[in-house]
Amino acid sequence: MCRGIIGRKIGMTGVFSDQGEYVPVTVIEAGPCVVTQIKTVETDGYSALQLGFLEKKASKINKPLAGHFKKSGGVGFAYVREMAVDDPSAYTLGQVINAELFSAGEKVHVAGLMKGRGFAGVVKRHGFAGGKDTHGCHSHRVPGSIGTSAWPSKVFKGRKLPGRYGNTRITTKNLKIFDIQPETNLILIKGAVPGSNNGLVEIRKINA
């Protein structure tokens, strides 16, 4: 069994459960993904499926990639990712993998690119409390002391300081699948997942 799929975050909404509880969910377009390469222990040292997601114009694909995609049907893809697989022999080149890989109630890990926030201060970037907001205070959102001049006479590596925040890959774990709509390849996941709307996400089974 393939252990994951590529998808695109559509956005967030809310639905009601059978018990009448309002549940915030993230809607993800999961696939359809096409198997573009099959990796085995004998040939590559490990087992995996290379999946292609979102078709791309042939004029936008370079010749090496076009030759690679030709082996799986000739259709080019904008995104290619590898997913672990239990038995590679159960799959063939060009085979389609969709949202039916998962089931409602299953827990998954979702990885994506965090929203980029640019250069940010310590209050926004690290959650510092900030200084006092009283009369006479001139340091409301500054980090404070980062070391003395006598000792250590330097700033230690890893010190929480202002800097570029976001635009990094993060994984949100143990999210529950609320519902699956196979006819539209939509997966409704309880809670929030990383990234902005239309951003690429990877949905993996636990222990993948």
Curated annotation (Swiss-Prot):
GO terms for molecular function: rRNA binding; structural constituent of ribosome. GO terms for cellular component: cytosolic large ribosomal subunit. One of its GO terms (biological process) is translation. Pfam families: Ribosomal_L3. It comes from the Bacteria. Gene3D superfamilies: 3.30.160.810, Translation factors. Keywords: Ribonucleoprotein, Ribosomal protein, RNA-binding, rRNA-binding. Belongs to the universal ribosomal protein uL3 family. One of the primary rRNA binding proteins, it binds directly near the 3'-end of the 23S rRNA, where it nucleates assembly of the 50S subunit. Part of the 50S ribosomal subunit. Forms a cluster with proteins L14 and L19. This is Large ribosomal subunit protein uL3. It comes from Desulfosudis oleivorans (strain DSM 6200 / JCM 39069 / Hxd3). The gene is rplC.
